[in-house]
Design a protein with these regions (language model features):
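Conserved acidic carboxylate
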Residues: 8
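Charged docking surfaces used in two-component/phosphorelay signaling
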Residues: 15-23
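Active-site beta3 strand of CheY-like receiver
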Residues: 44-50, 55
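The feature encodes the CheY-like receiver
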Residues: 56, 74, 86, 104
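C-terminal output helix
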Residues: 106-116
Length: 120
């Protein structure tokens, strides 16, 4: 079981991802924006961050970059899950330090498999 911080502003996506992750045996901490998410990461030291890109305030790209520049959090894998489906968006997310990039809506089995690969 891994502790995962979910940074997602959509209540629907929060509910779906939380259900999938808890069903897979993971503990989920949810933040509605990047600033709160970064605080959760610093306070709880998760094994993984699941991050949207389009968020109020700081974007998921900016938050991913911030996590990777901070000595205390730079080793934590980040999976970006976003509606931004262009190859340039994916490449940019990976350049910011994301471990993986998935387009919404992801398939449950694939998302859980990618998470489990990074946290085991």
């Amino acid at each position: 079981m891994a502790r995962i911080v979910l940074i997602e502003d959509s209540p629907t996506d929060q509910a779906v991802f939380t259900q999938w992750l808890t069903k897979a045996g993971h503990e989920v901490l949810v933040a509605n924006n990047a600033e709160d998410g970064l605080q959760l990461v610093r306070e709880h030291g998760p094994q993984l961050v699941l991050m949207d890109v389009v968020l109020p305030g700081m974007s998921g790209f900016q938050a991913t970059r911030a996590l990777n520049r901070d000595e205390a959090t730079k080793g934590i894998p980040v999976i970006i899950v976003s509606t931004k489906a262009m190859d340039t968006d994916k490449a940019w997310g990976l350049r910011q330090g994301a471990s993986d990039y998935m387009v919404k809506p992801p398939r449950e089995e694939e998302l859980i498999a990618r998470i489990n690969e990074l946290v085991t």
